[in-house]
Swiss-Prot record:
The lineage of its organism: Eukaryota, Metazoa, Chordata, Craniata, Vertebrata. Belongs to the arrestin family. GO terms for molecular function: ubiquitin-like ligase-substrate adaptor activity. The keyword Cell membrane applies. This is Arrestin domain-containing protein 4. GO terms for cellular component: early endosome; endosome; extracellular vesicle; plasma membrane. Induction: Up-regulated by high iron diet.
Length: 415
């Protein structure tokens, strides 16, 4: 629906003033796109106007303190911490009075004034409203009239800075592991360990995040694993920082008794409709994280937190491996261990590679030395000739003389 303002009172001669976008079904705009629409004006009788203009504005503001709504110190108190960044400032004239006359007369009836403008090609931060600041864009039509206050109508313009979750940094799997000793000093009851992995860093609204985790409870307490998505808002103003953090979604696991282990093989946590990550504004930032934590009675909770990016362009699945993360995740958490290489394959037999004919062609016969005579000398060189170009011994995994070897222990590598 378009914005509309009416004029009442003895001097009110404008019945309505409205602002309508050309594509009302378009939810949001991005940098470089065109915004089009028209201003609707209905006059009950002839109206004298100085002009009709259109304003498009966009800015990010962050402020807090005793005078957060003002830019000056009031009553000697502390000045407000405030900062502002301008993204859009545009003014268009839709109706002007003839030169030298100052006013124009608008006849009774309905009038329509089209407008069209392009958003800047530079990155525009996503629209957002938070506790200590906002990023807002608006379009306003202002009707200038002589001897009476200006009349205006305003429409919000939703802008989004697209984040593609198919970029390589956002397709990287995330994993962490941590252990906590329950108790203190000599009264420890054993450790609680937690390992967590997710398939990628980037997700979109409405997606469900499969969580892979293993919880091992070696303490004497009954523990409960939980997972949650947190939104963190960071505001910068006058060199100061404010942070707001709250939970947007959560899921709970089963109780884990002492000496027990629980595994999450893709436990789903759905992302609710939230503002996409805001990473390109210098005074307001919106980040997300996935926290998997364990509530331990009588002790601080054990928590692992993995960063998330909530994007706007969903995962395409292109180039996805056939095997899922679930197949790589087992009960013994094998993805945390360094896998040893497979046993090497035996090399081929030398005789299978080099034929006797080729051997004779490339190896000339040894001449008999002049200072050696007799059958013994010839036999010696014949032996050298026979074994000089022999292939190496065949590969064998079994020692043919095990009696001379000492027993060795197998070697394992643990991360």
């Amino acid at each position: 629906m378009g914005g509309e303002a009416g004029a009442d009172g003895p001097r009110g001669r404008v019945k309505s003033l409205g602002l309508v976008f050309e594509d009302e079904s378009k939810g949001c705009y991005s940098s470089g796109e065109t915004v089009a629409g028209h201003v609707l004006l209905e006059a009950a009788e002839p109206v004298a106007l100085r002009g009709l203009r259109l304003e498009a504005q966009g800015r990010a503001t962050s402020a807090w303190g005793p005078s957060a709504g003002a830019r000056v110190c009031i009553g000697g108190g502390s000045p407000a911490a405030s900062s502002e960044v301008e993204y859009l400032n545009l003014r268009l004239s839709l109706l002007e009075a003839p030169a030298g006359e100052g006013v124009t007369l608008l006849q009774p009836g309905k009038h329509e004034f089209p407008f069209r403008f392009q958003l800047p090609s530079e990155p525009l931060a996503t629209s957002f409203t938070g506790k200590y600041g906002s990023i807002q864009y608006c379009v306003r039509a202002v009707l200038e009239r002589p001897q009476v206050p200006d009349q205006s109508v305003r429409r919000e313009l939703q802008v989004v800075s697209h984040v593609d979750v198919n970029t390589p940094p956002l397709l990287t799997p995330m994993l962490k592991t941590q252990e906590k000793m329950v108790g203190c000093w000599l009264f420890t009851s054993g450790p609680v360990s937690l390992s967590v992995k997710i398939e990628r860093k980037g997700y979109c609204n409405g997606e469900a995040i499969p969580i892979y985790a293993e919880i091992e409870n070696c303490s004497s307490r009954l523990v409960v694993p939980k997972a949650a998505i947190f939104q963190t808002q960071t505001y910068l103003a006058s060199g100061k920082t404010k942070t707001v953090r709250h939970m947007v979604a959560n899921v709970r696991g089963n109780h884990i008794g002492s000496g027990s282990t629980d595994t999450w093989n893709g436990k789903m946590l759905k992302i609710p409709p939230v503002t996409p990550s805001i990473l390109d504004c210098c005074i307001i930032r919106v980040d997300y994280s996935l926290a998997v934590y364990i509530h331990i009675p009588g002790a601080k909770r054990l928590m692992l937190e993995l960063p998330l990016v909530i994007g706007t362009i969903p995962y395409s699945g292109f180039g996805r491996r056939n095997s899922s993360v679930a197949s790589q995740f087992s009960m013994d958490m094998c993805w945390l261990a360094l896998a040893l290489p497979e046993q090497p394959e035996a090399p081929p037999n030398y005789a299978d590679v080099v034929s006797e004919e080729e051997f004779s062609r490339h190896v000339p016969p040894y001449p008999q030395p002049s200072d050696c005579d007799g059958e013994a000398c010839y036999s010696m060189f014949a032996c050298i000739q026979e074994f000089r170009f022999q292939p190496p011994p065949l590969y064998s995994e079994v020692d043919p003389h095990p009696g001379d070897a000492q027993e060795t222990q197998p070697v394992s590598f643990i991360l």
